[in-house]
């Protein structure tokens, strides 16, 4: 704290923020995935019957799709990734069990980060994720994950540091908060979370790199000076800082590329049987025959009610043409998926 100087710690709010920063710094190593396990995962060949980094990254993108679908917050996603990585780095997991583990990590994180009424039911998550396991399987796997992580699931993550750095920076400047979008920073953090290499970075360093790159983009000298003082407070070496900043910069450059499949835009994919596909074709894409609506005429009560019901059923179908009957892989956006899976 002394390194920052009295000028930058003026006021009680600044002291409280740096006190919280010190607490986070003490906690972060405790919730860091085992580096040896992460390195082993990266070195595993893709054709082997063991978990590799590509499968892990794909599962994290699935977690992002689930958080989008159920309207969960960034905290749920980041916490689910932390639980997943800590478990995978600790245990020898077969690829066939990864779907069940991913669902469990999402549910465990949602119960910690979301309001009680916003936590999706287990059966709904199973149905949407198509993980091919039962509610009993999920319950057993949740118990295994919790026990292996010693029930320490509420981790200090890079998102905690990102929010805290953002608050510290604007506590000591007259700049408007709008110039440094927290939503944009969170989206960039999600992109980094989709790559296993960033699970080896300390959360405090990853968050600092993201904020540093964004401040350099908006070219604010004042904000950059404050952030460098925060870096000094962390006792972070230039070697470590510039190493991770370069990796983050490359990741964000690729993430901004039109060829990149961004997790925010990734659609849920359902593989269904041919019979189910035919039922979906006929039920969702069919255009019902609607009765003619007379101009200026009068309806009796029953006719009016029936007509209104028919129109609501066919309203969304009019602009869509049915795909080929041979196709059994469906790409739904979240609104359509909710209509099919959770009918009113």
From Swiss-Prot:
Entries under SMART domains matching the protein: CYCLIN
Nucleus in keyword set: yes
Inducing stimuli: Activated in B-cells by agents causing growth inhibition or growth arrest.
Disordered: annotated segments: 298-324
Biased composition (Acidic residues): 302-313
Tissue expression notes: Highest levels in intestine. Intermediate levels in spleen, brain and kidney. Low levels in testis, stomach, pancreas, liver, salivary gland and muscle. According to PubMed:9139721 also abundant in thymus.
Gene Ontology CC terms: cytosol; nucleus
The keyword Cytoplasm is annotated on this UniProt entry: yes
Compartment(s): Cytoplasm; Nucleus
Stored SUPFAM superfamilies: Cyclin-like
Gene3D superfamilies reported for this sequence: Cyclin-like
Coiled coil (residue ranges): none
InterPro entries per the UniProt record, alphabetical: Cyclin, Cyclin-like_dom, Cyclin-like_sf, Cyclin_N
Classification via Pfam families: Cyclin_N
GO biological process: cell division; regulation of cell cycle
Keywords associated with the record: Cell cycle, Cell division, Cyclin, Cytoplasm, Mitosis, Nucleus
Family assignment from sequence similarity: Belongs to the cyclin family. Cyclin G subfamily.
Cited function: May play a role in growth regulation and in negative regulation of cell cycle progression.
Descriptive protein name: Cyclin-G2
Record organism: Mus musculus
Phylogenetic placement of the source organism: Eukaryota, Metazoa, Chordata, Craniata, Vertebrata
Gene of this entry: Ccng2
């Amino acid at each position: 704290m002394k390194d920052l100087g009295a000028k930058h710690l003026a006021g009680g709010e600044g002291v409280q923020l740096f006190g919280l920063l010190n607490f986070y710094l003490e906690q972060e190593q405790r919730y860091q995935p085992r580096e040896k396990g992460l390195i082993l995962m990266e070195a595993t060949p893709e054709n082997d019957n063991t978990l590799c980094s590509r499968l892990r990254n794909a599962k994290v993108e699935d977690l992002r799709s689930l958080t989008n679908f159920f309207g969960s917050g960034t905290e749920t996603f980041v916490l689910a990734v932390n639980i997943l990585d800590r478990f995978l780095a600790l245990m020898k997991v077969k690829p066939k069990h990864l779907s069940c583990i991913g669902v469990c990590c999402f549910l465990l994180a949602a119960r910690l980060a979301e309001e009680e009424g916003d936590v999706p039911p287990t059966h709904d998550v199973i149905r949407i994720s198509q993980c091919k396991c039962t509610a009993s399987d999920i319950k057993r796997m949740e118990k295994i994950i919790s026990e292996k992580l010693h029930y320490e699931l509420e981790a200090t993550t890079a998102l905690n540091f990102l929010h805290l750095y953002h608050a510290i920076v604007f506590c000591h400047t007259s700049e408007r908060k709008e110039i440094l979008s927290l939503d944009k920073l969170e989206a960039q953090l999600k992109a980094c979370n989709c790559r296993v290499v960033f699970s080896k970075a300390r959360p405090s360093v990853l968050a600092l790199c993201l904020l540093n790159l964004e401040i350099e983009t908006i070219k604010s000298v004042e904000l950059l000076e404050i952030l460098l003082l925060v870096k000094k407070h962390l006792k972070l070496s230039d070697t470590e800082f510039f190493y991770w900043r370069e990796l983050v910069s490359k990741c964000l450059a690729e993430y901004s590329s039109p060829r990149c499949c961004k997790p925010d835009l990734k659609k849920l994919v359902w593989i269904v049987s041919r019979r189910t596909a035919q039922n979906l074709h006929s039920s969702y894409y069919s255009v019902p025959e609607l009765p003619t609506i007379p101009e200026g005429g009068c309806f009796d009560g029953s006719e009016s009610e029936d007509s209104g019901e028919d129109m609501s059923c066919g309203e969304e179908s009019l602009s869509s043409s049915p795909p080929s009957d041979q196709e059994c892989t469906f790409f739904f956006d979240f609104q359509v998926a909710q209509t099919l899976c959770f009918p009113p």
